Amino acid sequence: MVDNNKTVDNNYKHTSVLLDEAVKGLNIRDNGIYIDGTFGRGGHSRLILSQLGPEGRLIAIDRDPEAIEAAKQITDPRFSIVHGPFSDLAHYVRDLDLVGRIDGILLDLGVSSPQLDDAERGFSFMRDGPLDMRMDPSRGLSAAEWLMKASADDIAWVLKTFGEERFAKRLAKAIVERNLTQPMTRTKELADLIANASPFRDKHPATRSFQAIRIYINSELEEIERALDGAHEVLAPEGRLSVISFHSLEDRIVKNFIRHHSRGPQVPAGLPLTEAQLRSMGGRTLKSVGKMMPGDAEIAENPRARSSVLRFAERIGE
C-alpha cells in the first residue's frame, strides 16, 4: 500500500498508486455496498464515496490506529470505519448481516507511505527510529523484541522466505551476535549492522531484510490469504475484487487465488454444462477481469509505485 492522500493529512502529500484504476475496476453502482479493506489515509475511500449515490455504503477497515484517526475526518453518513485487520473482513460482514451483498472490495496491500515516512513507526531503514515495524503498535512483538528472542535459524528462515535474501544465514548470525552484547533497539542500528555484514551492494543491503522482518512481524502473507478467502465468501454475484500488490510474494498469492477460483472442474471436452451445473460440481466461482501496472508518468511522480500490480476478479453470478 502506497497511500498518500493530499486532502487527509498535510504531512504526507502524494497520490495513491493506481487510484483511479483500482476504483474503476470495482464498477461502482450508485446504491452498492463496498469495502475498502485498507483505508490508509483515505485516498481510495474518498474516490469511492464520490461515485456512490445517496443509498450507497462504504465500510473501511484498518488496523493502524493512525489510519483510524484519519478516518474520523470523514463525516459522510454513508461511511463507516472498522479498527482491525482486513483478514477479519468476513467476520465484520457477518456481524452486519451483509454476506453475499458486498458489491466490491478493494485491498491495497503492504505498508503505506505515511507509515514508511514516520521514523517513529520503525518501518524504514532510511530513517532512524524505534525498531518496531508493527502495523498496530498495541499488538504483538516489535521487531526489536522478536530479534532478541529468535534463534539464528529462525531469523535466517524469515530473511530467506520473506525477503529472498541470499545472505540470510550470515546476516542472522550477525544479528544474534550483536544482540548478545548490545541489544538493538533502533532501525539505524539494524540497517548499519546489515550493511556491514553484507557483501551485496546493488541497492541498500537492508532493503530485503527490513521487508522480510516487517512481513513476518505483521503476518502479512497470512493476512492476505485470509482476506482473499473472506472476500470470496462475502461478495455478491458479479461483485468485484480489486487488489494492488507491491512485491512478488504478495502478487503471487493474489494471482494464485484468482486462478484457483477461476478454474472449473475437470470435465470431458465438449460436455454441455451450464455455469450453474459447473458451480454445483464445486468449480469456478470467480473470473479474472485482468491486471494493470502503473505507467511511466505515475512511476516518475511516485517511484514507490514501480513494483505495483493491480489485479481484478469478479464473483460469478448465481
From Swiss-Prot:
Subcellular location: Cytoplasm
Keyword field: Cytoplasm, Methyltransferase, rRNA processing, S-adenosyl-L-methionine, Transferase
A biological-process GO annotation: rRNA base methylation
Molecular function as annotated in GO: rRNA (cytosine-N4-)-methyltransferase activity
One family name in Pfam for this protein: Methyltransf_5
InterPro entries membership: RsmH, SAM-dep_MeTrfase_MraW_recog, SAM-dependent_MTases_sf
Enzyme class, spelled out: transferase
Catalytic activity, EC: 2.1.1.199
Reaction(s) catalysed by this chain's protein: cytidine(1402) in 16S rRNA + S-adenosyl-L-methionine = N(4)-methylcytidine(1402) in 16S rRNA + S-adenosyl-L-homocysteine + H(+)
Gene3D superfamilies tied to this protein: Putative methyltransferase TM0872, insert domain, Vaccinia Virus protein VP39
GO cellular component: cytoplasm
Entry similarity comment: Belongs to the methyltransferase superfamily. RsmH family.
Main function: Specifically methylates the N4 position of cytidine in position 1402 (C1402) of 16S rRNA.
PANTHER family, A to Z: 12S RRNA N4-METHYLCYTIDINE METHYLTRANSFERASE, S-ADENOSYL-METHYLTRANSFERASE MRAW
Protein name: Ribosomal RNA small subunit methyltransferase H
Organism field: Yersinia pestis (strain Pestoides F)
